[in-house]
């Protein structure tokens, strides 16, 4: 089996770099020829390596997103393994990958194939979540240097400012043959289960062909935080709308910033669907 290790040396303070030679030896002991390649986000990581059987990605959700989108653009679908080494590793967490690098590498080397869902919005793919509104674009507003220096504290600082400047987002939502209009403060469309390691969609499944959509109605900052807390403790507040669907259309009259897996997302209107079983994960 031929495999490619695509690693983001800037993710998680570069902790993957010191493990690369050991990972190559580990895969070789399982009959897998692994070629390491540092990711350059302006380039095609698969150039010259289109016929691989397995791609192992080391980084956070944004790194996995980048690689999956390049796979789709190339029209290739090798098995995909994930070594979580970024600040945000929600998708890797959803499939139960260990946070320790060598344990994750061993899980992949010994692993089997699992077909899981992937989200798609107007030609762009996401593995974990598409989102917009308060707190949801914190990752793309936080500078990489801050992430490397203080990790999650950088997200908290940016998120606190986000709470104080939140505003209503007028939405028209079409889902399961029904339409609704709502002033929202936050919307998350999950393929995975967590955002920022917070279990906002704990009952979501990666292999059911469905998206889990959470829409939080607009209110003041205190009430908004209270409603989200009630949702987290399964209090089912009326201000939180939970939809399950295979596809959804979302429109807005304002130009709100959106986010997919921690990276800048598309503009409105958006047609979002679940591509059931389209990822060949190895773990």
Which residues does each PLM region occupy?
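Glycine-rich phosphate/pyrophosphate-binding beta-alpha loops
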Residues: 131, 188-200, 264
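Short glycine-/acidic-enriched loop or helix-start segments at secondary-structure transitions
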Residues: 16, 66-68, 92-93, 198-199, ...
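Catalytic core of DAGKc-family lipid kinases
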Residues: 4-6, 30, 35-39, 73-188
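ATP/NTP phosphate-donor binding region
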Residues: 1-58, 65, 69-70, 103, ...
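ATP/nucleoside-binding phosphotransfer catalytic cores, i.e., glycine-rich phosphate-binding loops
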Residues: 175, 181, 205, 215-283
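Short glycine-rich anion-binding loops that position phosphate/pyrophosphate groups of nucleotides
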Residues: 11, 60-63, 85-88, 132-134, ...
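Gly/Ser/Thr-rich active-site loops/lids in small-molecule metabolic enzymes
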Residues: 146-154, 195-199, 203-223
């Amino acid at each position: 089996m031929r495999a490619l290790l695509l690693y983001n040396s800037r993710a998680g303070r570069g902790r993957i770099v010191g493990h690369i030679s050991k990972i190559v030896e580990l895969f070789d002991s399982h009959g897998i020829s692994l070629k390491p390649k540092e990711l350059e986000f302006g380039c095609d990581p698969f150039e010259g390596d289109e016929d691989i059987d397995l791609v192992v990605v080391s980084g956070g959700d944004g790194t996995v997103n980048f690689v999956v989108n390049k796979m789709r653009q190339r029209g290739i679908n090798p098995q995909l393994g994930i070594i979580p080494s970024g600040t945000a590793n929600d998708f890797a967490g959803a499939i139960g990958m260990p946070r320790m690098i060598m344990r994750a590498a061993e899980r992949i080397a010994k692993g089997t194939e699992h077909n899981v869902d992937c989200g798609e919005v107007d030609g762009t793919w996401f593995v974990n979540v598409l989102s917009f509104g308060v707190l949801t674009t914190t990752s793309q507003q936080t500078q990489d240097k801050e992430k490397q220096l203080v990790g999650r504290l950088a997200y908290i600082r940016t998120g606190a400012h986000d709470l104080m400047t939140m505003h209503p987002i007028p939405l028209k939502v079409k889902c399961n043959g029904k339409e609704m209009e709502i002033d929202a403060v936050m919307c998350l469309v999950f393929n995975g289960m967590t955002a920022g390691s917070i279990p906002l969609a704990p009952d979501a499944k990666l292999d059911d062909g469905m998206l889990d959509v959470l829409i939080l109605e607009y209110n003041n900052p205190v009430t908004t935080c209270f409603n989200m807390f009630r949702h987290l403790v399964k209090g089912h507040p009326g201000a939180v709308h939970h939809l399950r669907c295979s596809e959804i259309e979302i429109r807005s009259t304002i130009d709100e910033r959106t986010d997919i897996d921690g990276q800048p997302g598309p503009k409105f209107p958006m047609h979002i669907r679940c591509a059931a079983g389209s990822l060949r994960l190895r773990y």
